[in-house]
Every structure is written in structure tokens, then in C-alpha cells.
Amino acid sequence: MRQLKKSASRSMLALFALAFCLPLPVQAADDGERFRDIYEREWDFRLREFPLFASYVGVHDYDDVLGRVSESDQARGHAVWKSIAAELGEISCERLSHDDCIDYRIFAKQIDNFIAEYETRAYLLTFNSDGGFFMEWGRLPEETRFRDVQDYRNYLARLHEL
């Protein structure tokens, strides 16, 4: 009887240990999926907020707009990036794959930089040694594709926004 009790206790202990370990891979998968969802949502936001950048990376959904840069637009972007940072804070890099962890760290740094640029009001600088708000306009003809009538219409729509 004692032997049976010991065996049952060991089995229960092993079962408990196994049950304790099982949620970790599920959590890792959940964190990986959450991370992908976060960066995909942020990427869509980034393309909408920076249509010239979208065109540059080959996304032509916003070829007819320049983007908005008012104080309220800056504040809205800041709120989105603060929210993204909070969501990222709920994900542990240790629960991600090695490659996702690297991507996570790079992405988190980009988000931190967007937040810092707003908080230091860097958007008020019209130009610096790296570029500037108005400099993008001068490159519009070079960076616009002119393959069909719609491309010309998109270009004219952007010029109209100036």
C-alpha cells in the first residue's frame, strides 16, 4: 500500500510539473503573435502618417497625399506610439524566438525614438544636417513614379496640398 501511495504521489508530482511547464510554449506563441500584430498595426499607421515614406518603400496607396503635420497630428501620433510602447512592455523578449527578439528590440527602439522626437518637439525643426520637412517636397519629382495618368494625378494632388 505504501509503495502504491509513493507511486501515486510521484505521478501526481510529475503531472503537476508537466502542467506547470505547458503554458510556457503557449505564452511564447501568444507573445510572438501579439508582437506581430503590434508591429503590423504600427506599420500600417506609419504608412498612413508618412505617405511619402509609403511611396518610397513601394506602397502606393497614399500617393496622392503629403501627410499632415499640425500640432494635433503630432499629438495623435505620440498617443499612438505611447500606446504601442505600452503594448510592447507587456511582451517579454525572452518568450520570443531569437529572430523575433532581435526585431522586438529594434522596433521598441524605433518607437522610443518617435516618442522622444515628440517630447523634445523635434518636429518643429524645419531642417537640420540630415534633412528637413521642406526638403522632401523638392525631391517629389525624382521620387514620384510617372507611369500612367493616375500617377500624374497623384503628383498634382500632392502639389495641391502644398
Locations of the language-model features?
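Non-catalytic accessory/assembly modules
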Residues: 29-162
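Sec/Tat signal peptide C-region and signal peptidase I cleavage site
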Residues: 24-28
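Bacterial N-terminal signal peptides
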Residues: 11-23
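Bacterial N-terminal signal peptides that target proteins for export
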Residues: 2-14
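Generic N-terminal simple sequence motifs
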Residues: 6, 19-21, 47
